[in-house]
Amino acid sequence: MRKPVTPPGNPPRPRSPGYGSTSLAPGITAANSNTRISPPTLARPAPAAGAGGQGGNLGLNSDRLRHAMVQRLRTQGIVDERVLNAMAAVPRHLFVDEALASRAYEDAALPIGHSQTISQPWVVARMIAAACEDRNPTRVLEVGAGCGYQAAVLAQFVREVHAIERIRGLFELARGHLRALRLATRVRLIHGDGMLGLPGVAPFDAIVVAAAGLAIPQALLDQLAPGGRLIAPEGASNQRLVLIERTGTASWKRTELEAVRFVPLRAGIQS
């Protein structure tokens, strides 16, 4: 079992990307957690490049801010250059409300509407890097697309990305963002139940799950390709990231990683 990893320079704390609940655990706030909270405003689809407004103005120096974010990720232990380059390429400020664009490159979760958040950059980088370490995945499934940011990062180096979002409003939001960045043909976005996966598209070289179940759904394990990896939070009050690799037709290798705090994985869809 690997020892839990905490990003250098950050005190140990729960982390909680995911979707469903709006409650915050003790000590977790919108600034230090990915727990999705009730937002003050609703996020809007990304404006086209060069558009006005605060998000468009931030674009003038967003390259510098993204570079600083990537340098911070390096100090926090992210070493996969594919992931770092992808994070540097995707304009995170276009995935949040214009009123929050100035905070887009902080290592913080930010509200995107529908009582949900965009996951903090370190969590996105950590999960993608773990799922793709020492391999070149060509088909990846994301469960819990949110505003589309993580799918956009994956699409920078993965040929075929499939992303499922159970909340209709977020599905529409993510679709608008991906279209604005001309990534709609690189990411197949589905409004559906992520716990079921996409059996008609499987197998997947990697699966990234953005909410915690008491156990990893067997349907998702079955949809991993041989040698494929799934990363997800698991547990109720005491949660950990788990990395699962398929080693045979009916065998999987499990490795526990960091202690985390995610909201529950939920079945079904929300219109």
Curated annotation (Swiss-Prot):
Comp. bias regions, Pro residues: 1-15
Gene: pcm
Superkingdom, natural source: Bacteria
Gene Ontology MF terms: protein-L-isoaspartate (D-aspartate) O-methyltransferase activity
InterPro entries according to UniProt: PCMT, SAM-dependent_MTases_sf
GO cellular component: cytoplasm
Biased composition (Low complexity): 39-49
Function: Catalyzes the methyl esterification of L-isoaspartyl residues in peptides and proteins that result from spontaneous decomposition of normal L-aspartyl and L-asparaginyl residues. It plays a role in the repair and/or degradation of damaged proteins.
Active-site residues from the entry: S119
Keywords: Cytoplasm, Methyltransferase, S-adenosyl-L-methionine, Transferase
Record protein name field: Protein-L-isoaspartate O-methyltransferase
Major localization class: cytoplasm
Stretches the record annotates as Disordered: 1-60
Entry's EC annotation: 2.1.1.77
One of the protein's GO biological processes: methylation
CDD domains named among the record's database cross-references: AdoMet_MTases
Compartment list: Cytoplasm
Catalytic activity annotation: [protein]-L-isoaspartate + S-adenosyl-L-methionine = [protein]-L-isoaspartate alpha-methyl ester + S-adenosyl-L-homocysteine
Family: Belongs to the methyltransferase superfamily. L-isoaspartyl/D-aspartyl protein methyltransferase family.
Organism: Bordetella petrii (strain ATCC BAA-461 / DSM 12804 / CCUG 43448)
Enzyme class, UniProt record, top EC level: transferase
